[in-house]
Design a protein with these regions (language model features):
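Conserved nucleotide-sensing/catalytic segment adjacent to the nucleotide-binding pocket
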Residues: 89, 96-140
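Glycine-rich phosphate-binding P-loop
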Residues: 60-73
Length: 264
């Protein structure tokens, strides 16, 4: 629970470390601890799948270049693909805009016994939408867009996540907390390293202008929606090896919680 945001806790991301803040040996973690964690995670994922009762949703949110894709690759690629599904949520399509903002999220929920991994999520609709005033482009009736719209959405999200938990689908939400300097370095590497050119988008550079606004809104998002049934974890993301290890431990703990000692 070291990185868990407690329900009702006042959150300011400025107060949270972006670097490895544990006294651990990097090479030992990478070669021994991580290997053991992934083996255990594979075992408990198999139990979750065999028991076919609970479903698990892992949400990854972060600033650009915080390591969402790399974390998914290194933590989840060792699991049985029959029981793991990764969904990346990008800008809503025309069809998605014709529905409520949770419609596409509901469609992507995993089956019982499965793990769904959300690369970004419904939280885009309380952060990115606000940063860029995209609510004006939505088809939501204008009389519903008032000063309380964001408080309303937070309530809707809390209610929906509680509903899922009460039906056996548990959500673990992870915010990869990267520093502005580290993000700059990673974006520069995408430009300079030909093997990473495909990752680069000029939009990532433009988004840096809104850094402070994003930090404030992500802080508010975590504060408003970290609950006992659907907690947020704020994970340092400046050291990729450490980030991946911490995420593996968080997911492993969730799998342990929702599996019986042996498959039925």
């Amino acid at each position: 629970d070291r990185y868990r945001a407690k329900e009702g806790e006042k959150i300011s991301l400025k107060k949270f470390s972006t670097n490895c803040d544990m006294d651990v040996d990097k090479e030992y973690v990478k070669t021994v601890s991580m290997t053991a964690a992934l083996e255990e995670l594979s075992l408990y994922q198999a139990k979750l799948y065999a028991q076919n009762t609970y479903g698990l949703i892992i949400v990854l949110q972060a600033m650009d270049a915080a390591g969402k894709d790399g974390t998914i690759k290194h933590v989840f690629s060792h699991l049985d693909p029959n029981g793991v599904h990764v969904v990346s949520f990008k800008q809503p399509t025309t069809e998605e805009k014709d529905h409520d903002y949770m419609w596409r999220i509901n469609k992507a929920l995993p089956r019982r016994g499965n793990i769904g991994i959300f690369n970004r999520s419904h939280y885009e609709d309380v952060v990115v939408t606000r940063v860029h005033d995209l609510i004006e482009n939505d088809k939501i009736p204008k009389d519903l867009v008032d000063k309380n719209i964001w408080e309303t959405r937070y309530r809707q999200i809390r209610d929906w996540e509680r509903y899922l938990a009460e039906n056996g689908f548990h959500m673990v939400k992870i915010f990869l907390h990267v520093s502005k300097d580290e993000q700059r370095d990673r974006l520069a590497e995408r430009i300079l390293n030909k093997k990473k050119n495909w990752k680069f988008s000029i939009a990532d550079i433009n988004e840096r202008r809104f850094w402070d606004r994003y930090q404030d809104l992500y802080s508010e998002m975590i504060e408003e929606t970290s609950t006992e049934k659907a907690p947020w974890y704020i994970v340092p993301a400046d050291n990729k090896w450490f980030t991946r290890y911490v995420v593996s431990q968080i997911v492993l703990k969730a799998c342990l919680l929702y599996t019986s000692p042996s498959p039925r």
